[in-house]
Amino acid sequence: MALELTSSFEVVDRRFRRLALPYIHVEKLYTGCRWAEGPAWFAAGRYLVWSDIPNDRMLRWDETDGSVSVFRQPSMNSNGHTVDLQGRLVSCEHLSRCVSRTEFDGQRTVLADRYDGRRLNSPNDVVVRSDRSVWFTDPSYGIDSDYEGDASPSEIGANNVYRIDPANGRVTIVASDFVQPNGLAFSPDESLLYVADTGVTHKRDGPHHVRRFRVAADGCSVSGGEVFAVCPVGVYDGFRIDVHGNLWLSAGDGVHCNASDGSLLGKILIPESVANVCFGGPKLNRLFICGTTSLYSVFLNTRAPPRA
């Protein structure tokens, strides 16, 4: 039961009141997407890039004047994005079935498109660790139909979580027991890896939860994988973790905030299903939210962890 309900927030636990201030409201920044996903913040340029997957384009929102423009079209049905430690865009591309990096001169570098000689399924979401390794999920969504990619059989025959070694580019499986691995993020100290499984989209009794793994001391493998939180409305898709270790999880009724102990603290209420989020703004305290058709934002009393 909610302790408090405003036009923008639902307080479930009193701890949420320290994170979501009652006088701040959700803003709609843009509408007109077919399916918004994968927001990524560019601090140097003060702009946000996100995907409109079925429309095969990426959009850009500028903080300075609030304008929205096409960043890239076609976009290879790009889904999730992140920004690496050098400030370059790293993207998951459905159509090309790869993880790519956009260089400063605009050239595109393929970081991974195969594992053990076989094509990846359709990379979905991606994160870069402080050691510069790239971790990504590879479910089947982009090869299930032509709507968000290219209907094709899986060459790998499994939906895995992978790591790209920063020294030699080698691609290794770090977790394989998933139905549909989706969003992923590290805890602030990078000792934990959280991964969403949205397998209920393919199996009626499939998972709709986030799992938590312990990262090995060498940063190359994980162990554990217990269920951290189960989504009560829809699925937990993309998410981010703040400096205090709270998870900000996209869900069917908005954004759920779960503490590091797994308990639900509260919700940011959005009038459509949410697919992904990211922190941005000069103080990294503005949460950008990709609803189905629209881009939203809200200022919070917390922020993203500092980058190494």
Task: Locate predicted features.
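Sequence-structural signature of mature extracellular/luminal beta-sheet repeat domains
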Residues: 1-308
